[in-house]
Amino acid sequence: MNSGILLIDKPIGYSSNQVLQKVKKKLSLKKVGHFGTLDPFADGLLILGIGKGTKLSNIFLNEDKAYVAEIFLGEEKDTDDLEGDTTFKSSQTVSYENVISALKNFEGQIDQVPPTYSALKHNGKPLYDYAREGNPITKPARKVIIHELKVIEFKFPKLMLEITCSKGTYIRAIARDLGRKLGIGGHLQSLRRLKQGSFDISDSK
């Protein structure tokens, strides 16, 4: 394949760039790019553009995405995911009804503050670099759209959601903000991307 699109089911433990480099080497490709990063702890659909296919990045990066997310309630972490240090812990429990009520605050267009550990840039430098140096920077809230939030399973402290959202949405931030809305903290425990635009994980290799 000299040009086109390749759909990968990214495994846990690899960065998006590591997967890209492995594919590039295995298929002896010169030009490869990915259309939407997945954190190393996350798995699921990763779209790669090959050759002239890399020019389609603007189209794919603007597409809606769907995920299955597992949120751990009762503990907040500095990275907003399972890999960070605990910053807040609560012994309080919440009911299914509490969760459903809180989730209503995350439907439709919302203002979302990006995680301080993210690849967003500040003066040309990724936010995660500032955070690791002990100088976290909080970016202004951005408008994102949550098209659907569906509870798959709830067994405290774990909540499994299916989320369909617009570009630029941080699922880690939803976990963080839901935990805060419930007053007990929360962080993202696992994440799997199911869809991006018209492409589905079932079409991947």
Segments from the language model and where they lie:
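Catalytic/RNA-binding core of pseudouridine synthases
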Residues: 1-205
